[in-house]
Amino acid sequence: MIAATSTMWDVLHWGGETQALIWHPKERRVIAINALGVAPSGATAEFFKSKGMKYPPEFGPLAAVTPGTPGGILVMLAEYGRLSLGEVLAPAIELADGYPMEAQTATLIERNKRKLKEWPDSARVMLPHGSANDDRKGPQAGEIFRQPELAATLRKLVEAEARALKRGASRKQTIMAAYDRFYRGDIATEFAAAVQAQGGLITRDDLANWRVKIEEPRHVSYRGVDVYKLDTWTQGPSMLQALNILENFDLQAMGYNSARYLHTLYQAMNLSFADRDFYYGDPAFAPAEPITGLLSKDYAKARAAQIRDRNDPRIGPGDPYPFQGDSNPFKDLIGAGQGGSAMPAMPAVPAAPVPPNDRPYSPSGVVPTVDSRLPDRSYPLDDAEQAFWRGTTSVIAADAEGWLVSVTPSGGWIPAV
């Protein structure tokens, strides 16, 4: 899987971010990998205000967070893999040296050529026919597509592993030597210099201080089936909330895809999404998400009681705090309803449009406006806010040995439900 992921530059590029759930057969547990990028230390509200921006840009160097995919791949391989980095990256290096471009990717590049032309390095690699007189600038389907700089970087990682092996390092240490070269060595120096030359903010210290986080996943049992999701830095727990709500209904009796069945699914997701948009955020920052209450079966029962035969457009976030023995610190923002319901008493920051993979996101899943409502603050990198990831990965334990893995694309429409 890791070797395949290393070749998927169209959707899992090395400048992007990675999330994963891993089943550990010996320990018989699910492990969560958080390789989400963080905003660079210079990406403060004051900085964007000084540029006359109300929002961080959608594209380009100022939109970039620290790359998480390289670190995520290397840590997963070091901690839980068996192959060497050289073995894993061999197919990726071969493809970077040149391969026949597939039609789908060729079409995607051509469709985005105007955007790619804004950035000289992107245009040089992705638009090899940029000086041609005809309209087409990107590679043709079947044309040999080469990325020599990427191949050179991948070879540097393999070289770092080989040098560490010669020094007598363990398998894990050799792979982490490649990690250090990317985030603290010559690759980091070159990366930061290139970003800054184009007006970006990522520094060498930003890269050096970034870490992959190995976490405990969130978990519920749905009718005896264990379901695992990543934490509230993704929207994954909203699926767990929806399943808890649906457990209060006899879906089988409704009939698969009947009007009542679809209505009930929609309403369960509507309720869980309302909680997601209000309560979810970066777990590294206060206030702590009321995740125990949100995933409580009793809270789900109270939310399920709100589902009626017709859609209720007034549905808002509920109050999960009593279901974990706490009081809600946001009562000034919500008006208490009945049965665990609550309605917004004032508008929150507007929800953001679907972001591209390189767009920084606020931890609550909305893009904050950069105006007087935002504090002027700059975090040390260890505390930097991470982007809110709208894609999500599931591991579903059907029984003692049977597993299902469900993944949906980024975008926030349906979290693998």
Question: What is each model feature region?
Answer:
Residues M1-I2, A92, A242, A268-S272:
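Short alpha-helical scaffolding segments that buttress acidic/His motifs in well-ordered protein cores
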Residues I2-A177, F182-T234, L295:
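Noncatalytic scaffold domains of N-terminal-nucleophile
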Residues E17-Q19, E215-P217, M239-L240, R390-V395, ...:
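Short glycine-rich loop/turn motifs
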Residues V38, G412-I414:
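A short acidic/small-residue loop/turn micro-motif
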Residues A43, I414-V417:
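A short, polar/charged loop-to-alpha-helix boundary motif
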Residues A188, A192, G200, L251-S410:
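Internal maturation/activation junctions in enzymes
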Residues D205, W210, R223, Y228-L230, ...:
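Generic beta-strand/beta-sheet core signal
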Residues G236-Q252:
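M16/insulysin-pitrilysin zinc metalloprotease superfamily fold
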